């Protein structure tokens, strides 16, 4: 190159100008060859800071390959609709983060998520905690890499509860002692009229939303049995507040008027600084033969957009995000529950009581269904829950109505495909 430049300088102005033009063309080509990957997410606060730190670390390393990574935080309320609208039209991100409950709908709708089984190697498959990769699988095809998980667990006020209950019998006995409804104090508080929270109790009985097919079974006998136990906790044992909104539950716990709650990691940020709290496994259910409560797992995955023009580079980024190195930052700094099992061998994670507690709860949790049909289950199930707890219908009647409603909606959904 030095000889070429010297000849150009000695060759006079014409040759020099020509040489400058050639070098400029090379620079333009090099710039055009650079790859920019765009990642969408909905994180805020510590999660956002940790995620962007991890992406920046990757971007620095990938710069040598001509790869630059940018991130965009999308408000959660508009996030799913934005993906559904943008990606099939060839717009939007190369990579996006979202929970598994929308996966089936996106696959059935087409041109949103890219199958990634072709890229997956055995080492990557084996690095995840149990049930994680399965949540990213739809009709035997893998569409995403699992990034983090969330579930509910038992959170208790240490000032009021010395030893957390291990069984439903212990739970009710302790909660009764700590309840004074007239004074607005309750032994237990959780959003029991929300089907997501109720699923933990339902699953203990062997209940479920769907049988294989998927076939909806909201009216299954096990679901009815779970609802009857919930009604006992509300009416006979009287250990739960009426109208359990998230705002009420937070207020009760922070005022020392709720000794225990069933909730997830999102609740911890709402706990007042002066509350000394602990976490424990959800209790086993005596009425279900001693089976554990099995909360639903919400598993966020890293998806490669079907419209991305650089799918291989996008997958390599996704693979890094689920690595041990990235996972340690996302877990320790972002307070996420990463899916890479090696992360939990690090002292900073293993010695953290909050992270360790949610990791223990994982062993008795189950992934939330990712069927397309799941989207039409929520409204009828929620209506049934509210009807039952208000006493407007028996569990048998309300769940049968919900079953018929879901069957009708699923038939319409499948007809429209």
Where are these regions (language model features)?
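A structural signal for short loop-to-beta-strand junctions that line the ligand-binding cleft
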Residues: 85, 93-94, 114, 123-156, ...
């Amino acid at each position: 190159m030095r000889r070429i430049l010297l000849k150009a300088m000695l060759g006079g102005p014409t040759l020099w100008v020509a040489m400058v033009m050639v070098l400029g063309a090379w620079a333009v080509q090099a710039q055009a060859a650079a790859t920019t990957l765009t990642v969408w997410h909905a994180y805020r606060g510590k999660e956002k800071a940790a995620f962007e730190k991890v992406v920046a670390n990757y971007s620095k390393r990938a710069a040598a390959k001509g790869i630059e990574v940018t991130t965009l935080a999308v408000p959660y309320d508009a996030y799913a609709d934005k993906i559904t609208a943008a990606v099939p039209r060839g717009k939007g991100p190369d990579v996006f983060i979202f929970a598994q409950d929308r996966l089936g709908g996106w696959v059935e709708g087409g041109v949103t998520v890219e199958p990634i089984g072709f890229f997956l190697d055995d080492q990557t498959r084996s690095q995840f905690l149990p049930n994680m990769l399965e949540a990213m699988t739809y009709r035997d095809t893998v569409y995403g890499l699992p990034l983090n998980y969330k579930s509910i667990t038992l959170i208790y006020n240490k000032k009021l509860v010395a030893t957390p209950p291990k069984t439903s019998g212990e739970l009710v006995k302790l909660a009764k002692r700590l309840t004074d409804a007239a004074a607005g104090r309750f032994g237990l508080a959780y959003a029991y009229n929300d089907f997501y929270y109720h699923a933990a109790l339902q699953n203990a009985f062997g209940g479920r939303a769907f049988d294989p097919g998927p076939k909806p079974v909201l009216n299954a006998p096990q679901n009815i049995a779970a609802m009857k136990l919930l009604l006992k906790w509300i009416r006979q044992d009287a250990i739960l507040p009426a109208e359990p909104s998230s705002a009420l539950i937070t207020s009760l716990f922070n005022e020392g008027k709720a000794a225990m709650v069933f909730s997830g990691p999102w609740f911890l940020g709402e706990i007042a600084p002066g509350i000394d709290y602990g976490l424990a496994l959800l209790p086993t259910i005596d009425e279900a033969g001693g089976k554990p409560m099995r909360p639903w797992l919400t598993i966020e995955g890293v998806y490669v957009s079907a419209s991305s023009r650089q799918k291989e580079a996008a997958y390599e980024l996704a693979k890094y995000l689920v690595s041990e190195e990235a996972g340690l930052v996302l877990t320790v700094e972002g307070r996420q529950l990463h899916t890479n099992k090696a992360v939990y061998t690090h002292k900073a994670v293993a010695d953290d009581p909050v992270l360790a507690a949610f990791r223990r709860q994982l062993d008795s949790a189950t992934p939330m269904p990712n069927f397309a049909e799941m989207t039409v289950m929520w409204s009828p199930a929620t209506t049934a829950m509210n009807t039952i707890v208000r006493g407007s219908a028996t569990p048998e009647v309300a769940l049968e109505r919900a079953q018929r409603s879901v069957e009708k909606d699923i038939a319409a959904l499948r007809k429209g495909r």
